[in-house]
Amino acid sequence: MNRRYVFSLSAGLLASSCMGAIMPVPVARAQQASTAMTGAQATGGTAAPRQILLQQARFWLQQQQYDNARQALQNAQRIAPDAPDVLEVQGEYQTAMGNREAAADTLRHLQEVAPGSVAANSLSDLLHERSISTGDLSHVRSLAASGHSAEAVAGYQKLFNGGRPPHSLAIEYYQTMAGVPADWDQARAGLAGLVAANPQDYRAQLAFAQTLTYNTSTRMEGLARLKDLQGFRTQAPVEAAAAAQSYRQTLSWLPVTAETQPLMQQWLTAHPDDTALKEHMLHPPGGPPDKAGLARQAGFQQLNSGRLSAAEQSFQSALQINSHDADSLGGMGLVSMRQGDAAEARRYFQEAMAADPKTADRWRPALAGMEISGDYAAVRQLIAAHQYTEAKQRLTSLARQPGQFTGATLMLADLQRTTGQIDASEQEYRSVLARDPNNQLALMGLARVDMAQGNTAEARQLLSRVGPQYATEVGEIEVTGLMAAASHTSDSARKVAILREAMTQAPRDPWVRINLANALQQQGDVAEAGRVMQPILANPVTAQDRQAGILYTYGAGNDAATRRLLSGLSPEDYSPAIRSIAEEMQIKEDLASRLSMVPNPVPLIREALAPPDPTGARGVAVADLFRQRGDMIHARMALRIASTRTIDLSPDQRLAYATEYMKISNPVAAARLLAPLGDGSGSGAGNALLPEQQQTLQQLRMGIAVAQSDLLNQRGDQAQAYDHLAPALRADPEATSPKLALARLYNGEGKSSKALDIDLAVLRHNPQDLDARQAAVQAAVNSGRKSLATHLAMDGVQESPMDARAWLGMAVADQADGHGHRTIADLRRAYDLRLQQVEGSRSASGPAATEEDALAPPSSNPFRHHGYGRQTELGAPVTGGSYSMEATSPEAADQMLSSISGQINTLRENLAPSIDGGLGFRSRSGEHGMGRLTEANIPIVGRLPLQAGESSLTFSITPTMIWSGDLNAGSVYDVPRYGTNMATEAYNQYVNSLSQNNSSSSLRTQQIQGGQGEAGFAPDVQFSNSWVRADVGASPIGFPITNVLGGVEFSPRVGPVTFRVSAERRSITNSVLSYGGLRDPNYNSALGRYALNHYGSQLASQWGQEWGGVVTNHFHGQVEATLGNTILYGGGGYAIQTGKNTRSNNEREAGIGANTLVWHNANMLVRIGVSLTYFGYANNQDFYTYGQGGYFSPQSYYSATVPIRYAGQHKRLDWDVTGSVGYQVFHEHSSPFFPTSSLLQSGAQYIADSYMQNATASDYLSEETVDRAYYPGDSIASLTGGFNARVGYRFTHNLRLDLSGRWQKAGNWTESGAMISVHYLIMDQ
């Protein structure tokens, strides 16, 4: 068996087989259901409807619509409850619902009913599969994907406990086993068994046929099976298409013989445009390259790179296989000539010419040119030292010597072409052709120039004049031309198509593969990129294979694979880029080993950056080490130190540091570094850059423009964001990323329809662009076009089922449709796929606008409005993480994984019913029996999710106890200020005076009472979603006064702006009086009855048994704007306060404020702000006599505070602490003792007047109390502030404990509180 073909396909086969394994119900089972239904229809009886119902149940299980699956299963159970197939689906349903114990019971029953049946075996396999660790399975799959087939097979066997594989994993297991030569026969037998057991399992049929094609002895049988599979396009379209691709690939492996030629001709009849197969038939390669050919090819590549020792070794290896190999002999002659050994070079050339006279012309110029080889050797030394100017001067002089014009000019032209002087090189090639129109080297050189410029037709015309002896070189030039054409287009779909054509022509060319892989990554198809690179990563044959593999794995951030490939590459084969990577790997390894021994990495960073860094590799290495650990703080520090060590940075340094700055999301620093380079042409600022440097510069500039635009868009400044993006839109109208950024700007301004037009236009241009598809799905949801969003998402999943982004788009659509469980399933699928990708890279390798209108950039800034526009100074975004010596987990190191995990956790909690219980305490300052308040409550809250977690219904009941303490009955100041105790004390004074004058008086004094405790429970029902909240409830039932409470708030969001409008009726909880009301102790006393009898209905209408229980009817509006990390808000409102037997009041209030993020890392944040507040009441009711409300109600209140918030989390612990300090000024008017009763107020006035006339120093009532019947006003200015803290700890996914405390000083009161609460998710979704 040819291992080369096995490794080239193993990754693709494994990826396709994994798709079935991660489905909740394996695809093979759905196919079995379809087959069973077909057979049932033929047999008739009760089996047919039963099989149809079972097929429906399996379909709904696959769609994760479990209610529908249960209904279909129950209907089937009514027909035949003990039928083996019914029991099998019953077990599958129980497994999908997570009820493994029930599924195990079902399996035992099934084994009793039908022992050894297919149904029993299938259900047993399913239960075994579900017991396998997902993490272990992902690790084994990553081993297989990286080409470590033997290790992967051992891993699978460990998962299977040495037994046979579960049905859903059998195909991928045997496919992986087929990659181990010693196990190929066993793999074939295993797949043959699967096919025999179920001929309609098309995935097994495909895998079996493909495995047969890998071995020359069974290749024709595999071809026949692949051809048969192509006929099942209706039943199995995916497998049929894959079979066609495998069939075509296998044809290219076959020699052209009488047996194989008809097969190839049949294919060409159906596919007349397959030029590669035509070429294969005309010029059959004779099978895979022999070892001598590979060694010879490597020798010439090494020779062209100046690595003479490696080239000599390669040519000698080829000659050991075939000592008469003319090309290898000639290669040795070239090596000897460059080494300065003229005699040895002459001997090798002569032997080469004698070995193959037909190719003797290749070596005659070299033999003739040996006389001046010293000059050419000197030129080559200059080129190797990058002294291009001196080399060109020597070549120009050399061309003037007799007989040297052609050779020197061609060498000069080649040098000019490779250093980017395309026009000059074209002129030199043409000068050679002017003297010698058929000069083969000049024709090929000029063709390379035309290919590089995109002039494909002209290049091919030149190549048509090249003789067949240069067929290999001509093929390389055509491939180079295709690669140049690909580099000249920013259309990712066209670029991929061009590079696929190039790979068809040069399947083993590593540079074609890496360019195609990079193009696929830019298109978003990371999995396919890995499959393209897999052959050279798993089995690198040449040094160039390793070089390309190193560049690919380095770009993917896979340091382990990069080091592995480097270990097999000789330092002589290092290119400048590879040498830079090798140095970076060494720096990282050394620094990482020392980090574990120090508590502070800063000294090590400075030490590592002390040596010179001419290419920027050292600074990038140090910064990238910390970036990979999630430590952005020290990554930024390393880059800052590296980029400021010298004033005059080289272009290489600027490009390297800027690239790393972009990796850590700091486009501002990257732009600052690139500014001195200008446009790279040298016409303006900066020197001229090499072509590769110019390309890197352009890519960085585009990325910076997009990043800065997104940053400003987050801040809500779409106008300035467009100003940053417009140059990128103009520079490359075909580029995708600026267009998608423009769509995000429209989304940010609330113009979702316009954003959708742009996203759809990009998607029509390149349907494989998953980033564009994701954006289109979100824009469609934002525009209210949910059906379109679902259609786009489903297309993405069908086209790219192994890409996490496709499932993220599906999650957006499903959530918009209210399918919460399906949304979680989509997110979990995306998480698993992304995790596999990350672990794999770590361990190994209305009518819409027209497309033109949507894609065209606006002629002017559409986000710049008249009279609006502010210039925002861009600052570096604050990112980073705390230093840790431990390597980060995949989730912590990968932004997509972290985001998906957060979405899953949030949605899981939103979908799960929950119950909360707690115990809270509150204490408010004031006089005993009046303003002082102590409260204890036990809130019990239940929450039911609605609409896929987008909404919820919350029920709560809160037992509440409040008390104010006992009134100080001996206080001459407190007693008259409570209820109607002023009358009581006046009466008692009268009785005492009368008793002194008449000892026989029968009148008795009344008892002073005051201060009450109350208890009750407060019910409430609340509905809420993202933009509306409404509730209805009551103040505690059991208090003297109970009020119906409730409210509604609307909070629609338009772009970065949120509008809040609310209307609510709430209790004022400042005191026992305002919260629950009080009963006047005098109402039923003898004095009270006397007063009511004496004053009759007039007093009865002004005096009741209870007063208080105040509610505020509040109407409020607010606007909030989120501008990046800053939140601005402002609003105002009006309220009316009413209570039982209390004076009505009204309030006006307004406030503005802002807060901004001043620091954050991966786990913590700090925000600081400022808040300005005003409110004022019509009258002052902050007192406790009858008719007063007992709540703080100044006539004007102003405050300015500075709040600071610190929040964070660490593992299971999270916290949120806010503190504020400020200054307040408020003014209170005077207020009558009894504002609702003219009789009581006139009595109070009479008592006050009488006191002023008759009081003595020993009187019970003090002058301070009754000098007038009004409470005095006041004006106060003082500090204000407080804090609010919460600490939570999550014991399990379902259970969380919260502790909170607060203290506040405001107005004329202080308040403190504490609570302990438990949050429990009843069902873990």
From Swiss-Prot:
Residues 838-886 are annotated as: Disordered. GO terms for biological process: cellulose biosynthetic process; UDP-alpha-D-glucose metabolic process. Keywords: Cell outer membrane, Cellulose biosynthesis, Membrane, Repeat, Signal, TPR repeat. The keyword Transcription regulation does not apply. InterPro entries: BCSC_C, Cell_synth_C, CellSynth/LPSAsmb/PSIAsmb, TPR-like_helical_dom_sf, TPR_rpt. Pathway: Glycan metabolism; bacterial cellulose biosynthesis. SMART domains: TPR. TPR repeats lie at residues 50-83, 85-117, 292-325, 326-359, 406-439, 558-591, 702-735, 737-769. The keyword Transmembrane does not apply. It comes from the Bacteria. Pfam families: BCSC_C (PF05420), TPR_19 (PF14559). It is found in: Cell outer membrane. It is a peripheral membrane protein. One of its GO terms (cellular component) is cell outer membrane. Residues 1-30 form the signal peptide. Required for maximal bacterial cellulose synthesis. It may be involved in the formation of a membrane complex for extrusion of the cellulose product. Belongs to the AcsC/BcsC family. This is Cellulose synthase 1 operon protein C. It comes from Komagataeibacter xylinus (Gluconacetobacter xylinus). The gene is bcsCI.
